[in-house]
Each structure stands twice: as structure tokens, then as C-alpha cells.
């Protein structure tokens, strides 16, 4: 089976490819980036909007991921604004010095500076849309936010997120370790199970 991954985020694409290749699913990269306005109020809505847009452009079943971090002390933030948290009014805007991930992390740590409750969770919703059919799956991983970034692997908020049962941040884990426990990995494995039981998908 072939799926078009509706993203230009290299980190997301790499993780999705690594996990789905274990199940014999071939993933394709879009030839060009589509500007899809994420107007949904939820991760699921935004994933659907992206999957539908890429399917309509390429006529290949499209897989879209919308995911993010929810921090208990400032819930529902960063939430659906996770990738652009630095630039929203809540908590004040943060200057981008090197890259957006760094600015997002800097803002998050600033907001949690005097907060004892550092519980958080990563959430992922993944949609596959094929025109006449569509399916979705979700995954999450709970953990805590560190007081400073650690590790140089992964992307996004990985350097400040320690999953439950671990003493390393996501950015300190190997790709294999991360994919085994991550929100995206869990959602993708659920999705594969649904795909293999959905005759319309083949």
C-alpha cells in the first residue's frame, strides 16, 4: 500500500516513514508544499483538513498528522498552537533567534518558571483520507516538562519532555526508543491495525 504523507516537516516525515516501513507500507513525499490553513479547533479537524487537501491535489490516499503538546498548568496550551506557540498572544510573543522550535521552548519554560506542576502530554491525531473513505487514530504519551532543554535528537518540544517511566527527554532517546513510546508511534500502530481490517483501503 502507498500513502502520501501530507507534511513538509522533515522530522514528522522521517518518523512516519520509519514506523510504517515496519508494516510494509510505502510512504511518498509530496512534490510541493500545499498551504493548508489549519482552521480547526482540534487536532483531528486539522489533520482531516490537511489529508483532504493533499488527496484532492494528488489523488493518492493521504496521511496527515496533527499533533502537539498540552501542558496541565496552562491547558489547553500550547495545544493546536504548538508549532507556532511563540507567536500567539497567550503569555506574550517570543522572538525567533535561531529557529521556531527554540522560540517555542523558550516561551514554554518562561511561562512555567515558577510552576511546580509540570505535567504534560503529547497528543497525535492521524487521518488517512482516500476520497470516498477516511479513517483516523489517536495516540498520546504522558510525562513532565524539564526546567531546561536536554538532548539533541528529535524536534519540537522533545528536548524538554520526559515521558513517564523515563529519566531522559525525548531528545535524549534513540529514534528506536522514541518511536516505540511516542504519541505518533502509538497512533500510527493503531492506524495500521485499522487499515489492515479495512477492505476499502486496499
UniProtKB/Swiss-Prot annotation:
Question: So what family is this one in?
Answer: Belongs to the HAM1 NTPase family.
Reading the lineage from the top rank, the first entry is: Bacteria
Reactions catalysed, semicolon-separated, are: XTP + H2O = XMP + diphosphate + H(+); dITP + H2O = dIMP + diphosphate + H(+); ITP + H2O = IMP + diphosphate + H(+)
Example of a GO MF term = ITP diphosphatase activity
What EC number(s) are associated with this protein in UniProt?
A: 3.6.1.66
Look up and give the organism this protein is from.
Aquifex aeolicus (strain VF5)
| Keywords of the record | Hydrolase, Magnesium, Metal-binding, Nucleotide metabolism, Nucleotide-binding
Entry annotation: catalytic residues: 66 (proton acceptor)
What lineage is this protein's organism placed in?
A: Bacteria, Pseudomonadati, Aquificota, Aquificia, Aquificales
Tell me the residue numbers annotated for binding substrate. Answer: 7-12, 67, 155-158, 178, 183-184
Listed under GO biological process in this entry are: nucleoside triphosphate catabolic process; nucleotide metabolic process; purine nucleoside triphosphate catabolic process
This protein's cofactor list reads: Mg(2+)
Q: How is the cofactor bound?
A: Binds 1 Mg(2+) ion per subunit.
Oligomer status and interactors: Homodimer.
Protein name (database record): dITP/XTP pyrophosphatase
Q: Name one Pfam family in it.
A: Ham1p_like
Biological role stated in the UniProt entry: Pyrophosphatase that catalyzes the hydrolysis of nucleoside triphosphates to their monophosphate derivatives, with a high preference for the non-canonical purine nucleotides XTP (xanthosine triphosphate), dITP (deoxyinosine triphosphate) and ITP. Seems to function as a house-cleaning enzyme that removes non-canonical purine nucleotides from the nucleotide pool, thus preventing their incorporation into DNA/RNA and avoiding chromosomal lesions.
Positions binding Mg(2+) in this chain are 37, 66
The record's section on CDD domains has:
HAM1
GO CC terms in record: cytoplasm; cytosol
Amino acid at each position: 500500500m502507498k500513502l502520501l504523507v501530507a507534511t513538509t516537516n522533515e522530522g514528522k516525515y522521517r518518523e512516519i516513514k520509519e514506523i510504517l516501513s515496519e508494516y510494509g507500507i510505502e510512504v511518498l513525499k509530496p512534490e510541493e508544499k500545499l498551504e493548508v490553513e489549519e482552521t480547526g479547533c482540534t487536532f483531528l479537524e486539522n489533520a482531516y483538513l490537511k489529508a483532504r487537501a493533499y488527496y484532492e491535489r494528488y489523488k493518492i490516499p493521504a496521511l496527515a498528522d496533527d499533533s502537539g503538546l498540552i501542558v496541565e498548568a496552562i491547558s489547553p496550551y500550547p495545544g493546536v498552537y504548538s508549532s507556532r506557540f511563540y507567536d500567539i498572544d497567550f503569555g506574550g510573543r517570543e522572538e525567533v533567534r535561531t529557529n521556531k522550535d527554540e522560540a517555542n521552548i523558550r516561551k514554554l519554560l518562561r511561562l512555567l518558571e515558577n510552576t511546580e506542576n509540570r505535567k504534560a502530554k503529547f497528543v497525535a491525531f492521524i487521518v488517512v483520507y482516500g476520497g470516498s473513505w477516511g479513517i483516523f487514530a489517536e495516540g498520546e504519551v504522558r510525562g513532565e516538562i524539564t526546567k531546561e532543554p536536554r538532548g539533541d535528537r528529535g524536534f519540537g518540544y522533545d528536548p524538554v519532555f520526559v515521558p513517564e517511566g523515563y529519566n531522559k527527554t525525548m531528545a535524549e532517546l534513540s529514534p528506536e526508543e522514541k518511536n516505540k513510546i511516542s504519541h505518533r508511534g502509538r497512533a500510527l500502530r493503531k492506524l495500521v491495525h485499522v487499515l489492515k481490517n479495512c477492505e476499502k483501503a486496499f
